[in-house]
C-alpha cells in the first residue's frame, strides 16, 4: 500500500519507498527475534539486492545496526555449499563451514542522523500494517 503520496512525488520516491518498506520488514523481523531474547548485532546481506549501496544504507539506518555484504551474491549456492561441507564431514559444524566460505566484502554503518525519521516511518508502517492486516487476509 502506498500511503501519503501526492502528484509531486516521482518514480524515484516510489522506488525508495519500496526499499524502505522492505527495510521495515527486516526491522520487524529483528524486533520479533528480540522479543524471543535473540539479539541481532548485524545484518548480513547477499543476493542481487546487496549490490545496492543505497538499499544497504537504508536497511542499516532503519535497523540502526551495521550491515555487511559478503563475497557471494548467490545465496542458494552458498547455503548449499555450507550444508554440503558439514554433511560430508569437511567441517565440524555450520559455523565453521560458513566462516570458511564467507568473507565480508563491505560494512555499512547506520547513519544516526536518519534515526528519527526512520523511527517515525517504522511506527507508521507498524500502524498501517496492523490496520490493514485483516484486509490482506480477505479475498475479493
Where are these regions (language model features)?
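Glycine/Thr-rich phosphate-binding loops that ligate phosphate moieties of nucleotide
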Residues: 1-140
Amino acid at each position: 500500500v502506498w500511503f501519503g503520496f501526492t502528484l509531486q512525488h516521482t518514480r524515484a520516491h516510489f522506488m525508495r519507498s519500496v526499499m524502505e518498506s522492505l527495510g521495515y520488514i527486516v526491522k520487524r523481523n529483528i524486533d520479533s527475534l528480540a522479543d524471543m531474547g535473540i539479539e541481532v548485532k548485524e545484518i548480513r546481506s547477499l543476493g542481487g539486492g546487496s549490490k545496492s549501496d543505497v538499499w544497504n544504507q537504508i536497511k542499516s539506518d532503519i535497523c540502526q545496526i551495521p550491515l555487511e555484504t559478503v563475497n557471494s551474491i548467490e545465496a542458494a549456492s552458498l547455503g548449499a555449499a555450507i550444508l554440503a561441507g558439514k554433511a560430508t564431514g569437511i567441517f565440524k559444524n555450520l559455523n565453521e563451514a560458513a566462516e570458511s566460505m564467507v568473507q565480508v566484502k563491505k560494512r555499512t554503518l547506520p547513519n544516526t542522523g536518519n534515526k528519527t525519521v526512520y523511527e517515525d516511518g517504522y511506527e507508521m508502517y507498524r500502524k498501517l500494517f496492523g490496520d490493514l492486516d485483516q484486509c490482506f487476509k480477505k479475498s475479493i
